[in-house]
Each structure stands twice: as C-alpha cells, then as structure tokens.
Amino acid sequence: MEYKTLNNGVKMPVVGFGVFQVKDEEECKRVVLDAIDAGYRLIDTAASYTNEDAVGAGVKRAIEEGVCTRKDLFITSKMWVQDMKNYETAKRAIDASIEKSGLGYLDLYLLHQAMGDYFSAWRAMEDAYKEGKLKAIGVSNFYPNILTNFCEVVKVKPVVNQVELHPYYTQEKALETMKYYDVIPEAWAPLGGGRYNPFEDEMLKGIAAKYNKSVGQVLLRWNVQRGVVVPKSTHVERIKEIEKNIAVSTVSYTHLTLPTI
C-alpha cells in the first residue's frame, strides 16, 4: 500500500474504501469488515451518509478479529452543512461523529462543503485537532478561489481537499492551487460518478487491455499517479474486486499512457 504524507506529518493511504450510499447498517458493517480484511486501511464516511456508527462497528469487529489494530487504520468523516451554523454547532457535530464511530478519535475530518459559517466550523475543528480528537483536518468541494482565501486566513491549513476528479473532469486549476498550499487532492467519483460510462469507453478499454487491468484499475491508477488519494466507493456486489483495487497502488503504467486519457 502506498501512502501520502500530509502537511502535518500524518501518513494517509492513497487508496481507500468509501461507504457513500451504503445505508443498511448490517450491510455497512459487513462490507467495512470485508474491505479491511482484503487490505483497505482508509475508510471514508460522513455525517450525511448516516452510517458512521456502522463503520465504527465494522472497524471494531476487524480489530477484535485480529485483522488490524486501530493505529493501522485511517478513518475519515465529514461535517455536514447544517452543523456549520456556528462554532458551537460544529463542536457538537465533531463530538457526535466521534461518539457514533465509537473509535475515540478520527484520523481525518473534513468540512463537506464551503457553506454556512465554515470559518467558525473550522475553528472548532482546529481546537479538536489540538485536543487530539482529530489527527488531521481538511475540506471538501472547495473551489480554487475559495481554497486560496481559506488557506490565507486560517491558522491550521487543511491537509486535504476532496473534490470530483476523473479523466472527464481533470480539475487542473484546482490541483495547481492545492499543490501551492501543500494540500493533498482526494478524489470523489474517481470512476466518473455515474454521469459517464468509462467502462464502455473504447480508449480506456484499450489501455486496460494493454496492461491487462480492468478499466476501473486504470482510472484509479490514473488518479494515484497524479498525486491524488482515491477513497473509491465500491458496490457490495463488487466487493470481491477489492484485492485488485488495492493492487492499484503498486502497479505503475508508463507516463506515455497518461496524456492519452
């Protein structure tokens, strides 16, 4: 497994498992356990996914079964907009996420959107970070101009900005801004987010055939080679492909391929 070192020194796996749209509690527990058992160490959830408790239960089960330790894992959650009203609502949201997970702390906590009083919400996150409740703090869906203004003002700079990133939406300006402020890009919808059909894309199929990989692996590796962390959401019926996705972090495609995508 490859890791990225964040601007505060914390190491983050480059390929992760996202639980967006895994609503059923028992199903979520099971797929999280299966993902960890298969080798995933980054688990990505959010308050708005309403499954922080199930993620925590799956994690604790994996620890109980000796698959991993808590320190082996990197658990991410996010604060939703309704909790960004002010400092106090944000502080309660942070504590609620930690309590629901039952894990004692979170490795990464993000502002899910640049909405509401997100500066006050960030101050609450800074304080929780200093208290050790959050090992790293970041943002999500911050456009380049918003991220620039944000980084110039806050005391603790975000370590990550999770944004939509895939070959159909490359976000070059966003990546340039993140690099300037030493913010690691993290992709949501690395496979196109349902608006595109990369698995029927002849160019991508050709690249996959060339390297004897799946189209999904090519897309994930494309992001990884651009310095992007990928917490891919995996449908339950494709859980058996996890091992192949983990292998993405160790497979290198020639740079001649990348400009083609």
Model-predicted regions and their roles:
Residues Q21, A47-Y49, M79-V81, M115, ...:
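Active-site-proximal loop/turn and secondary-structure-junction residues that shape catalytic pockets
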Residues K23, Q82-V159, V163-H166, T170, ...:
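Glycine/proline-rich, positively charged
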Residues M1-L73, L191:
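N-terminal binding-site loop/beta-alpha segment at the start of enzyme catalytic domains
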Residues F17, I43, V55, I75, ...:
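Conserved, mostly hydrophobic/aromatic
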Residues V15, Q171-I242:
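Glycine-rich, positively charged active-site loop/lid region within alpha/beta enzyme cores that binds
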Residues V32, E52, G56-V59, K91-D95, ...:
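Generic structural signal for well-ordered alpha-helices
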Residues P13-V15, I75-S77, Y109-L111, V139, ...:
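Hydrophobic faces of well-ordered beta-strands that scaffold small-molecule active sites
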Residues T254-T260:
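Conserved small/polar residues in nucleotide/adenosyl-binding loops
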